[in-house]
Amino acid sequence: MLDVRIDDGLRYMDWIELQLAETHRLETEADWAGKVSLNRELYRAVAAAGNLLFAGAFVDGELVGYCSAFLSRHPHYDCLMCQHDALFLLPEYRVGMAGLRLVQTIEREAARRGAAYVAWHAKPGSSFEGILARRCRREDVVYLRQLTKG
């Protein structure tokens, strides 16, 4: 049975980097991204400030998916915002509402901590984009121009 819960994401950095992030990269960034190398210094600093959100999806205690996000004061307005960082679930666990449970867990935790909203991003045409289109308001469109080879 899949257990989705808020947890300490720093505990899982090695597992994510060695077991999950490369699968994630190959699925979503294979054409341009270089080798997976989590910026641990950044994650530790964000966590130390109390601004790292991490939801894990676990099967028999093993992490099979995750969603991470950052809390910060909006740079232009007087509110706390939450920015989605990463969302990944191993393909064999993408059944039913598993991915949505990760999203909802982050949203609940962000609201509990006082965030006014969560800004989500998704690859165009992905199933995640479809989920977001049904439950969120489209606000900005992000374009990526590659400047170096991955």
Residue ranges with predicted function:
Residues 1-36:
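Short amphipathic alpha-helix that is part of the acyltransferase structural core
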Residues 44-56:
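A short helix-loop-beta-strand connector motif used in the catalytic cores of GNAT acetyltransferases and
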Residues 56, 62-71:
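Conserved beta-strand in the GNAT
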Residues 73-84:
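A conserved beta-turn-beta hairpin within the catalytic core of GNAT-like acetyltransferases
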Residues 85-95:
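A short, internal acetyl-CoA/4′-phosphopantetheine-binding micro-motif in the GNAT/acyltransferase core
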Residues 95-108:
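Conserved acetyl-CoA-binding loop-helix of GNAT-fold acetyltransferases
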Residues 118-129:
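Conserved beta-strand-loop-alpha-helix junction that forms the acyl-donor binding cleft
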Residues 121-122, 138-149:
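Conserved catalytic-core motifs of GNAT/GCN5-like acyltransferases
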